[in-house]
UniProtKB/Swiss-Prot annotation:
Annotated Gene Ontology cellular component terms: plasma membrane
Annotated organism of origin: Escherichia coli (strain SMS-3-5 / SECEC)
Parts of the chain that traverse the membrane: 34-54, 62-82, 219-239, 254-274, 588-608, 616-636, 656-676
Protein family: Belongs to the cation transport ATPase (P-type) (TC 3.A.3) family. Type IA subfamily.
Protein's job: Part of the high-affinity ATP-driven potassium transport (or Kdp) system, which catalyzes the hydrolysis of ATP coupled with the electrogenic transport of potassium into the cytoplasm. This subunit is responsible for energy coupling to the transport system and for the release of the potassium ions to the cytoplasm.
Residues at the catalytic site: D307 (4-aspartylphosphate intermediate)
Quaternary structure and partners: The system is composed of three essential subunits: KdpA, KdpB and KdpC.
Name of the protein: Potassium-transporting ATPase ATP-binding subunit
Catalyses which reaction(s): K(+)(out) + ATP + H2O = K(+)(in) + ADP + phosphate + H(+)
Amino acid sequence: MSRKQLALFEPTLVVQALKEAVKKLNPQAQWRNPVMFIVWIGSLLTTFISIAMASGAMPGNALFSAAISAWLWVTVLFANFAEALAEGRSKAQANSLKGVKKTAFARKLREPKYGAAADKVPADQLRKGDIVLVEAGDIIPCDGEVIEGGASVDESAITGESAPVIRESGGDFASVTGGTRILSDWLVIECSVNPGETFLDRMIAMVEGAQRRKTPNEIALTILLIALTIVFLLATATLWPFSAWGGNAVSVTVLVALLVCLIPTTIGGLLSAIGVAGMSRMLGANVIATSGRAVEAAGDVDVLLLDKTGTITLGNRQASEFIPAQGVDEKTLADAAQLASLADETPEGRSIVILAKQRFNLRERDVQSLHATFVPFTAQSRMSGINIDNRMIRKGSVDAIRRHVEANGGHFPADVDQKVDQVARQGATPLVVVEGSRVLGVIALKDIVKGGIKERFAQLRKMGIKTVMITGDNRLTAAAIAAEAGVDDFLAEATPEAKLALIRQYQAEGRLVAMTGDGTNDAPALAQADVAVAMNSGTQAAKEAGNMVDLDSNPTKLIEVVHIGKQMLMTRGSLTTFSIANDVAKYFAIIPAAFAATYPQLNALNIMRLHSPDSAILSAVIFNALIIVFLIPLALKGASYKPLTASAMLRRNLWIYGLGGLLVPFIGIKVIDLLLTVCGLV
């Protein structure tokens, strides 16, 4: 689930943003945005000029200079407001997280075991390596790993999901997060971080923007904007001697107004807001990004590594068919398969019991009443089963059962090999059942491909993104599911080493790779990937290796993460196109007005037929300020984004924002000029 979305212009946030906008007028804050710093200097200069004119120290129209100065200050304030509003929305989201942090005491154990003597210490004094005991009703005081016990944990304060989760020692569910609450039982936890370094602390710092640094693309765009500003600054500086040589020197106020209207103030004023809003939108999807760089990288990704289970398929494989070996009755196979699954509580095991009941009316039997011994599945044996009387029944992967049969002096039948291949080609997973050394047949486990996933992959392909399915299945099963789902490639029988090698291979080809993971064995690959989304339900090692954490622990979220990243890049590109395009329209307003007296031929450029030179210049400056406010919703919400090829996206961008950037200023400046004239303000 996602967190409650804030209204775009929440009244309390707007008021706070206005206050922050005024505070940001401090030159120490302004110089970080070079384009708007030039506007700030121009505002200060024209303010001094208008005061000097009003006092008679300088000749000129004091009222006109004051109006220009006022609107230049408004331009700076609007740019500050856009950034402050974006930051305010992020801080509001962070405040909801701060409520989770509670000053509490923890029971620090003197020995790493349940029942050991404990000391009551403030939670904020716990250090990495300390052992604590938490029981039902307690708030977990630190991030850590469960070393003993198991408990139901309410993580809704972090994830927004109301359903409790089980945390227990061992495996991939041993990681706990400080600030979550124990609902039942108890846990002995080893703290994995020092104070101020918890997941919650990092989340708050990231969301508040305290650690926000400019991304590479943002830096490159800033350099471009600075270069354009320097060019226009030099060009404007040379205009004064030209006009003076013509016998009618242009005033400094007009030159400052010209400079401000020519430099890319629109994108300059909104650039920071776009970056902050991108991270905020990611949080709206319940994904915490460690930096803007991670969000930006998501927009540039061109290879997605997707786990099959839970991402491409529903993840709950169900027994669909019993396929007996030659000379074996199907009911005999079903009976043995059901016996081997009686104590198997996995979805697959339960489905085998149910299928045998449905097909042959075989009732469930109690393992204890049968005086049987259940053999659990392990990663080493890759099979499970039951020992009952003199019968030894096992079910498991083909390779595991083959080794088991051969170890017991038996022979794996060729016809079963054929049946295994047949099941795998159909996209199902084959489990082989054996009694003693005699192979009884194959169980087909069918996993269902998610509806609509093939269409989503087609959209990603259209965008130039390659999809690769990662699965532990054999190559035949993987190939069948890959074909059904519509992915571009697959990695079968995947191991952590194989994932890491595949990522490095794609990166060596100059591609950017995104993946998800939740286990400690995923950590090396997550650390190597350009965009690494760790599941919040995963281990501490996985979360530390990734550069994003999905609070919903939903592997499918990776596609949404890429969408948000591309939307941020699209928004930045769209507003840059619009900003540069609307500068062209402003040339036709200001240049004829500023120099018509010196060079009458320039009147031919006054295609908007503006009322007077003063109204033309003032209208352009007013429009230049107002357009920032009108574009704030676009900067915060993001430009509309559709899965298109790069060339189609460029054409769409140029038509909407390029042509729009040309037309909107012509209309806006003309309307403002008419209003100023009608109201008698010029």
